[in-house]
């Protein structure tokens, strides 16, 4: 479920982006809705609201959520400040590649792979399976970053659509594939190994 919370601001961004540009009165102020810049403002505000609500309810945010929020604030603010959507186009590639870097780093730093730190409380798997799973996430994030970058700078007319629905589609497909893979290997785990409950 956590993976899909990140898409709430993106969906709002998409809706505002698709609105035909218009000027509306908001609390006595004229505000332009529609297009990339008002959509970017909505993305920033909705991200602050969503992650702020999560922080209040959970008393913390995951590191991945902090990264997503900070990237949204930085790239979104640069987009508005310089009136250039180029900055926003780089957000998804940079975030995905930073995630990939974190998973890569866990092969060399720490006593457990990152995917095992994330999912180890719920699953008991042989170490080779954890390794393959971690590598799969690295490949996924590298591919998502490259795909977002390619579409953003090659297909101007559809990059926002891809940013939202392409990313969501790739995430769903990957999670389904991961589930199928895990279902084949859960029985390989040592049944005597205790599993920590939530």
UniProtKB/Swiss-Prot annotation:
- Predominantly, its location class is membrane
Q: How does it sit in the membrane?
A: Multi-pass membrane protein
What subcellular compartments does it reside in?
Answer: Cell inner membrane
Keyword Cell inner membrane assigned to the entry: answer is yes
Origin: domain of life: Bacteria
Its keywords, alphabetically, are:
Cell inner membrane, Cell membrane, Membrane, Transmembrane, Transmembrane helix
Q: Which InterPro entries match?
A: YciB
Annotated S-S bridges: none
Segments crossing the lipid bilayer: 4-24, 36-56, 67-87, 90-110, 135-155, 162-182
Determine if Cell membrane is one of this entry's keywords.
yes
Q: Name one Pfam family in it.
A: IspA
Q: Which GO terms describe its cellular component?
A: plasma membrane
Family assignment from sequence similarity: Belongs to the YciB family.
Entry function: Plays a role in cell envelope biogenesis, maintenance of cell envelope integrity and membrane homeostasis.
This chain's protein is named: Inner membrane-spanning protein YciB
